[in-house]
């Protein structure tokens, strides 16, 4: 368990190449990461949006790639997207004939719940989310007033009234959690605002950053997935299309990072980031 002091938490959203390189060098020293042979990997963590599919359309060769991964180790679909519940991901992935259960999926919602259970189990949550997401939190926590905690999720039903309520609670000192820091979510036609954009809006209104961000690249997600899989980070690979969430997550937590160029990041972005990763055009090429 990570000890966290709410009053001293500072989240820096402005990463530069120098900072990332310094951090990566430090992590390499701490975790003694070597250039991992992909054949040594026992757990494959796969981002979804931009890695396995884009806007609901399976990336070419992804199904066959996942089948090959399963012959070598465990495959977990690891996503920051907190807009829907886990059962929706099961249906979506099975509609793509990927053959998954809830035991094959771990989300930023899972990481958020796990953090709350360990650190604030009796919280009364004001969840900025869809009705189904709120109902999901209600299985484990109280989601009725008086609220003492705000949980900001990727709410595609976001309204002005929800923002007003959340900002009022945050301004009055409520514990403030965000599920993940992604600014945008990739769609087939472009990008739409994600939780990172909501965070900036809330900060502009309240002058507060989240006390805890639970998804990639932060510690709550790493702790949660480690407990979920039981596999050492040394034998775990994170596949994703985003440098500052997926690949930074791998670097910060002793995993092998595999950047796929099927989503947000380009090869030029990677070269200027200072982060350490294997680079592939898509997940289909993971073992080539």
State each model region's role.
Residues 5-11, 15-46:
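Non-catalytic pre-domain segments flanking phosphatase-related domains
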Residues 79:
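Conserved phosphate-coupling serine/threonine residues in phosphotransfer and NTP-handling enzymes
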Residues 31-46, 54-71, 83, 87-106, ...:
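Asp-based, Mg2+/Mn2+-dependent phosphohydrolase catalytic module
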